[in-house]
Amino acid sequence: MQSQYPSAHAPTADEAMLWNREALPPGPGQEAVLRGITGEMADKGFVVANLDKLVNWARTGSLWPMTFGLACCAVEMIHAYMPRYDLDRFGVIPRASPRQSDVMIVAGTLTNKMAPALRRVYDQMPEPRWVISMGSCANGGGYYHYSYSVVRGCDRIVPVDVYVPGCPPTAEALVYGIMQLQKKIRRTGTILRG
């Protein structure tokens, strides 16, 4: 069986990091890239990297949500923060102030009276900011869709990045939604250019 590493010895931690899924396949092309990086390190003492990817990677590990619990979905959101699911392991730490958060989780039925408050809190969040709509009521009105006092989806008030379906969605569904948001952040550039 042929080794996936170019040398016969067991890889060091640094070598193993180079051979992840996004790396070049082993071969002359990869060796040329590695020689170029090694030469640049020897000449300058540093490597020029893509700042946008680095910042997006850092943001995915430190999402600070502003929890906007409006109804029964908020109970499932609380479950996601408890020891069984422990969102802290993903770097997701809830904040009480919108000025310190970059993600808003809208969980539950949004009424017409609450909609201006939701928009005000969203506007107070610093850029870049993301919104997760959690539950059928936040996604499209849910069970109360035809009520005169219910907004038929929070995406009519704020732009939504991830929709978590369910009535109420499970804590696992919220964790999956947060992981999908992390993927979205990694894929898109978020550094504002003037």
From Swiss-Prot:
Membrane association type: Peripheral membrane protein
GO molecular function, one term: 4 iron, 4 sulfur cluster binding
Binding-site residues, [4Fe-4S] cluster: 72-73, 137, 167
Signal peptide coordinates: none
Enzyme Commission number: 7.1.1.-
Family matches, as InterPro entries: NADH_UbQ_OxRdtase-like_20kDa, NADH_UQ_OxRdtase_20Kd_su
Protein location: Cell inner membrane
Protein name: NADH-quinone oxidoreductase subunit B
